[in-house]
Amino acid sequence: MFKKFFIAILAAAAFTLAADPVTVEARLTEIPGKMPSNDLYSYVYVYKYKVLKVVSGKLDAKEILVGVYNPLIARGKVKDKMADKSKGNVGEFKAKAKHTLKIVPLEGNWDGAVEDEYFDDESPRYLAIEVNE
């Protein structure tokens, strides 16, 4: 009984540590395709970023694929259930812009529609829970 309890505690601790956000400074390299309007449905749109610096946490990738919830709405202006995962001060996403991103794995943090033009790229997807200029 104690052994099962101990294993459950270790598993929960590992999951908690793995879910800690990573903060990076990165440049938005491209905006693929056309974003759907927000009046159709809520979605996460995947952008490609070049990592310039890891500010906190651990990340080895030079490029990352980052999903942003309803990117046509300015960060900090999202008022629905995803408001806590849509923080920041970016008003509009533009190619070549430098952002400070707080990211978590997309899987497990978003289960809705994903607009992802990088279907041939098997890199992990992240969700930006905060984006600042």
Give the location of each predicted region:
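Structural detector for short beta-strands of small beta-barrel domains
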Residues: 20-52
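Positively charged n-region of N-terminal signal peptides that target proteins for export
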Residues: 1-4
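Disulfide-stabilized netrin-like
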Residues: 43-48, 52-133
